[in-house]
Amino acid sequence: MVPVSFAFDFCGEEFRLTADRALYWPREQALLVADLHLEKASFFARHGQLLPPYDSRETLERLALAIRETGARRIYTLGDNFHDSAGTERLEPHAAGMLAALTRAVDWVWLTGNHDAQMEARAGGTLAEELEIAGIVLRHRALKSETRPELSGHYHPRLQLTVHHRRIRRPCAVVSKDGHGCGRMILPAFGALTGGMDAGDPAILSALQPATAIDAVLPASGRLVQFPLWRAAA
């Protein structure tokens, strides 16, 4: 299945948000994904909560597809890559082989998050706490009062909607705007086994201040749609 994507402007740059929760940056030939949480199921299994042990394989298969279909030559993961520091040691052989092949095929950078305090580059690629590319900061968690354009993860935002009297939840990006036609963005979690926080939660809205507007953005009905979450007082 081709991961359909939708173009939009962010701080003067074209980005494409895929229906499968990845963000492609055409000018940089870069694919950005947040919160993979690889080996989350095996972490819970070690603590007595048995879950199907296929989350890492599913996440990596989806990521490989996104790389093929976008033609990305660089990957930036925005933190919380493995669910815990021992996750790389628990990868089953097939998933480990997939990850090794991916990190050899593209220029791969792991940005580290709160789950990655002791992460080592044993899975391939390189490690960084944050980067700035073309004036846009990439980091795991939005830095409150950051004045530069920023792409981050951490919060796993999801939009809650009521459709035909049914409540549904969909992963989304959350995008803020400042008074200069730019802003910051929190990406949805890409991992197969990740929960989510309501996109309008005060923790998310506070993290993106200062702002003049904050919207949830997600693909729906074959297009990219925006739902207002917060507006500055007139």
Residue ranges and their predicted role:
Residues M1-A234:
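Extended recognition/assembly regions associated with phosphoester-bond processing machinery
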